[in-house]
Amino acid sequence: MISDELLDRMRQAMGFEPTAGQAAAMNTFCHFITDDDRRTAMIMRGAAGTGKSSVAGAIVRAMQSLRRKVVLMAPTGRAAKIFSLNAGSPALTIHRAIYRQKTFTGDMSGFKLGFNGLHDALFIVDEASMIADRPMPDAAFGSGSLLDDLVSYVYSGEGCRLMLIGDKAQLPPVGEEKSPALTTSTVEGYGLTVYECETDEVLRQAYGSGILSNATMIRRMLDDAAPLSMPRIRLKGFADIQAVAGEDLIEQLSDSYSRAGMDETIVITRSNKRAGIYNAGIRARVLDREDILSRGDMLMIVKNNYRWFEPFIANGDRAEVRRVRNVRELYGLHFADAELSLPDYDGAEVKATIVLDVLSTDAPALTREQQDRLFGGVLADYDDLPRKQERMKAVKEDKHYNALQVKYAYAVTCHKAQGGQWAHVYIDQGYLSAEMLTPSYIRWLYTAFTRATEKLFLINYKTQD
């Protein structure tokens, strides 16, 4: 039988004896992919350290050995890069895979659902906990609901199927109580028969990791019927997790930048304001940078941009500054021209205009007042154009109106870090009162813990030992 051959190939591709949960997941996949009903989907849930990435990699290699088309996707650039490395096959962001820019609209930000010309392809989406199903206000992409559009795109292709992989204990999308793409009833609501499985057995090699041992303890608090209490983090006997006092942070961060590299070190905070404080302190006291933007600065894009890179640069993408020039003040804002490289896109180089004011504010992007002032100022520059349509088109193509909105990327909120992994991760939870000890906080802490691959540092954190 085809399913028997597929199962054998998956086991061979895995290269080691699977756990009971992994074996069950592979069996479920065989039933899913060989079902005569093509309106089927599969959800594979799994916590950190349970080996779901190994199962996904085995599925990809087995399907490719049978000459079946497999398309890998993830919500963010860094998540796609990690998925690609784990699966040994290229991966795209969901947005880049399913959307195409509208033509002849004069609006550079209009993206419609693309055409899926594939036949009998398997689409696998990692980090699916991040996928929202609520329409976003003023959304530039498709219907505005990423999950709606993803399902529509996949099943518009003849015989195509969707597999969603994620961790239900992680933070759900902003404004959601749980992750819709990992919720069976939500996916069934699209008229799909859903196969589901969960890898819940922590792999033996994970027991020696303080990161995964503590993350597992934190995750299990979500399933415990007892009232929530402060997680009792254990450090003793683990080399990969440690507490850091505030007075030692500068020296420790400097060491991480030297050992792991700036692109593999991150500070995770509870708020944009805390991230801003850390970013300012790191630039001044660790990196010794005085100018607002310098060569070598790591940035994070905070608003989708369609002007400088095809097809677009997404909110959450990271950039490294290679060169800064022509700093200037216009329209009550400050701008600079910069040469950037995008590490999540194989170091692709971009020349762009950046608005500098977002770097030093607590706001997540330009405020409505700043945006309106910028629009009015740029529009006035094109008063010589006789027709309103011409003036609006000129504004939408203007380099200052389309300037990249960025934040420093040394410290970010957990939602911004989600989907990514770093060798060295520093967690600052800030002040935490008894009222703030909620399931949402536990998910935040679990998500932050599981961003680290080598070393985790807890800043001013009360631990068990």
Predicted feature residues:
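C-terminal accessory regions
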Residues: 335-465
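ASCE P-loop NTPase helicase motor core
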Residues: 26-27, 31, 36-234
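N-terminal pre-Walker A segment at the start of P-loop NTPase domains
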Residues: 10-28
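Conserved SAM-binding loop
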Residues: 18, 72, 267
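Conserved helicase motor core of P-loop NTPases
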Residues: 3-6, 25, 29-30, 37, ...
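Short, conserved phosphate/pyrophosphate- and ester-handling motifs at nucleotide-, phospho-/glycolipid
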Residues: 22, 76, 271, 419
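Conserved adenine-nucleotide phosphate-binding loops and their immediately adjacent elements
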Residues: 2-16, 45
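Short, solvent-exposed amphipathic alpha-helical segments in soluble enzyme
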Residues: 88, 282-285, 442-446
